[in-house]
C-alpha cells in the first residue's frame, strides 16, 4: 500500500498493489492495482516491464517524473520492487493472510507493532502489542522457541521490526504482507447485493412491492 502522491498534499490516497513474479529469477508476470488517482500511470509502468520481460529488480530502477502533487518521492512501483526483492533475497519472510487464518496459535507468537492507540482501535485476536519504537527494549517479552508473526498497518513497520528481531538472534520471523489493512480487506465478508429487479417499474408496481416487503417484515 503506497500513497498516490506526497502525503503532505491534500487528497493523497493509498493504492493497493499486487504483483506476481517468478520465485526463480524475479521475472514479473502480472500486476493489479486498486485505488484512485495515479492508478493508470502505475499500471502502465508495470505493463512496460512485463512487455520487455523485466523483473522485480527493474521496478526498483525505473525513473519516474516526480512532483509532490502527483507522485511520491519513493514511487509505489519502486516500493513494490523493494518488497519483492526483499522476499527473493531472503531479507524478509512473508506471511500471507491465508496462512494467518489457519495458524495454530499455540505454536506461534503474534505481535502487533503498531502504536498503543492504533492497537486500542482494533487488533487481531491473540496479538500482543509491542510498538516498533519499543521493540529493542521489550523483545525479551517475545519467546525465542517458536515462530514470531508480526503485523502493522500496511507492512512497513512489520518489516522493520522483523529486521530488529533477526539481527538479535530470532530464527523464524514472518511479516504479514499488506498488514492489517489487506487482512481485513481479504477476510471481511462482502455485503449482500441489493435486489434491483423492480427498478424502473410503475408507481403502482412499486406500491405493491413496498406492501409485500412491509408484510414480510411484520410477520417476522
PLM-predicted stretches and their roles:
Residues 1-2, 114-116:
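Histidine- and/or cysteine-centered catalytic micro-motif in compact active-site loops
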Residues 27-28:
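Hydrophobic "anchor" residues
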Residues 54-109, 116-149, 153-220:
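Rhodanese-like catalytic fold shared by cysteine-dependent sulfurtransferases
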Residues 3-7, 32-40, 67-69:
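Glycine-rich phosphate/pyrophosphate-binding beta-alpha loops
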Residues 1-24:
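Structured beta-strand/loop patches that form or line metal/cofactor-binding pockets in enzymes
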Residues 37-56:
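A short, polar/charged loop-to-alpha-helix boundary motif
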Amino acid at each position: 500500500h503506497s500513497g498516490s502522491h506526497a502525503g503532505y498534499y491534500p487528497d493523497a490516497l493509498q493504492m493497493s498493489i499486487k504483483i506476481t513474479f517468478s520465485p526463480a529469477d524475479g521475472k514479473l508476470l502480472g500486476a493489479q492495482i486498486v485505488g484512485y488517482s495515479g492508478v493508470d500511470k502505475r499500471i502502465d509502468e508495470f505493463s512496460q516491464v512485463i512487455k520487455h520481460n523485466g523483473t522485480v529488480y527493474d521496478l526498483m530502477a525505473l525513473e519516474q517524473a516526480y512532483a509532490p502533487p502527483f507522485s511520491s518521492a519513493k514511487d509505489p512501483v519502486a516500493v513494490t520492487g523493494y518488497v519483492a526483492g526483499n522476499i527473493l533475497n531472503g531479507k524478509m519472510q512473508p506471511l500471507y493472510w491465508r496462512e494467518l487464518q489457519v495458524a495454530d496459535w499455540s505454536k506461534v507468537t503474534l505481535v502487533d507493532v503498531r502504536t498503543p492507540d492504533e492497537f486500542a482501535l482494533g487488533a487481531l485476536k491473540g496479538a500482543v502489542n509491542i510498538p516498533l519504537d519499543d521493540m529493542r527494549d521489550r523483545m525479551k517479552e517475545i519467546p525465542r522457541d517458536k515462530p514470531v508473526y508480526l503485523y502493522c498497518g500496511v507492512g512497513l513497520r512489520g518489516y522493520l521490526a522483523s529486521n530488529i528481531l533477526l539481527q538479535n538472534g530470532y530464527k523464524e520471523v514472518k511479516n504479514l504482507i499488506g498488514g492489517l489493512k489487506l487482512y481485513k480487506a481479504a477476510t471481511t465478508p462482502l455485503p449482500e447485493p441489493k435486489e434491483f429487479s423492480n427498478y424502473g417499474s410503475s408507481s403502482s408496481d412499486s406500491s405493491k412491492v413496498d406492501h409485500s416487503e412491509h408484510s414480510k417484515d411484520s410477520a417476522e
